[in-house]
Amino acid sequence: MAPPENGILEVLENLLDRYKINLLQMMFGTFIATIVFFGGLMTFVEKYLPNSIRQSFRYGKHSFKGETDPLVAWLEVPKSWFKHFYTFALFWSWLAFYVLVSTVREQKEAPEYVLQFLDIMGGGRSHRKVEIDSTTACVGAFMLTLQCTRRFYETNFVQIFSKKSKINLSHYAVGYVHYFGAVIALLSNTSGFVRGSKPMEFSLDKLTSQQILYLGVFFLAWQQQYASNMILVNLRKDPRTGSVKTEKHLLPKGGLFNLLSSPHMFLEVVMYFCIADLYMPVRIWRLIFLWVASNQTINALLTHKWYQETFREYPKNRRAIIPFLL
């Protein structure tokens, strides 16, 4: 029997194209709406919320301490599982970076299976347009790949997770979806990855002043985030032996912690801003930045409140996530 003229993927692609359904935009738009809605509830009316919502939203140092909901507890996994989606992010980002560099080097359109995948995720072949040149894409992909690589290293070989710390399964799943979508968004509107387009040649001479500036800002934020994370790691280590002495959350001092309760979250926002502004013509990257900024801000506010309630001597000049402001 001959195979059907249209395969399942082609039917799906035509459906998405016909109704202008952009799966990437839907994903991150949903993330933004969810974090803003529940984050607002947690910030302003948390005491009136059922324990199931409070328990689902909170984790880590500001995890819910009241009477737990059995069903929500059943849906929790160890916080150390963060390392799983950073392992995925490492593989996925390097794969995309390799495909991008190969396409630019060979000066030919991406393979058909890549184009079809991007058509499905990015709104259909007739709605995907070239908005990003190859040099910008290489810079942005390099940034995100570098960040994924360092976070993989930290979560798998450096970070000390409390054995008692849990996260809701939804947080765990969102980690995978975030990196899955963000990496795809690097290519979805890039020359050579849109049908009928050819990648442009890459050259360091073609780097613009904006790209050079953002590379510098990104590297500084990248390095400072690592330094901030190491301060948190060292709080749980014996300074003489280097062995783990506690799994408690202690008061961090030094570096950007002298200004902020969560400098690592502030720096995450800075790094994503650098990528998103380079990709400014692409709507999906504006959504990704808004998602990251809102998520990190809500988490930082909850963390800041926990520090203030836990440590009487907590410095009054520290802000939650934006130096001197918030």
UniProtKB/Swiss-Prot annotation:
InterPro entries membership: 3-oxo-5_a-steroid_4-DH_C (IPR001104), Dfg10/SRD5A3 (IPR039698)
Catalytic activity: a di-trans,poly-cis-dolichal + NADP(+) = a di-trans,poly-cis-polyprenal + NADPH + H(+)
This protein's UniProt keywords: Endoplasmic reticulum, Membrane, NADP, Oxidoreductase, Transmembrane, Transmembrane helix
Any GO BP annotation: dolichol biosynthetic process
Signal sequence residues: none
Free-text function comment from the UniProt entry: Plays a key role in early steps of protein N-linked glycosylation by being involved in the conversion of polyprenol into dolichol. Acts as a polyprenal reductase that mediates the reduction of polyprenal into dolichal in a NADP-dependent mechanism. Dolichols are required for the synthesis of dolichol-linked monosaccharides and the oligosaccharide precursor used for N-glycosylation.
Protein name: Polyprenal reductase
